[in-house]
Design a protein with these regions (language model features):
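Positively charged
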Residues: 1-163
Length: 163
């Protein structure tokens, strides 16, 4: 498999899948990303959405911590009003780095997790989470909704109902 670049699947909202289907897809994605990171030691890829991998399925993986995070049919349930800007790259747009805005924190519901997952930092609650992980999860969930990082540039950020 290879990462899709100029493919209409990247601009399409992905189909919901069963947890078993999602796990099978995620295994292939994790294997690909780990092998790719091992081969390209200078550049670490942090996440991958199924549609980038050529599969119309609402599945994403994030490789920031020791164990890969798998999200099947993820949906952002809550998010901070506060946003931060940082540079992002994307496997589907190699060698591109752009400034994007992301929410400081998000709460995500996924079919393969019993409880909502929290990513980011709630300054008002002294919760110093990982804002990089929050940004990567937002980036990958956006892919599953047919959005790319170009849609999150400071002057083109989508409204919450587009998530």
């Amino acid at each position: 498999m290879r990462i899709l670049t100029e493919n209409p699947l990247l601009r399409k909202k992905c189909k919901l899948v069963t947890i078993d289907q999602g796990r099978l897809i995620a295994r292939r994605m994790v294997a690909y990303l780990l092998a790719n990171n091992k081969k390209n030691r200078n550049k670490k890829d942090l996440g991958l959405a199924a549609n980038q991998f050529g599969i119309d399925a609402s599945v994403t993986i994030v490789l920031i911590k020791q164990k890969p995070l798998i999200l099947i049919n993820p949906k952002i349930e809550k998010f901070s009003e506060i946003k931060f800007m940082h540079k992002e790259g994307c496997l589907s747009f190699p060698d591109e780095l752009i400034d994007v805005y992301r929410h400081l924190w998000i709460e995500v519901k996924a079919d393969n997790h019993k409880e909502n997952l929290f990513f980011g930092s709630r300054v008002d609650q002294n919760n110093s989470g990982d804002i990089l992980e929050s940004a990567v999860v937002q980036h990958e969930i956006a892919h599953l909704n047919g959005l790319t990082f170009y849609d999150f540039q400071w002057n083109t950020s989508p409204t919450p109902d587009q998530w």
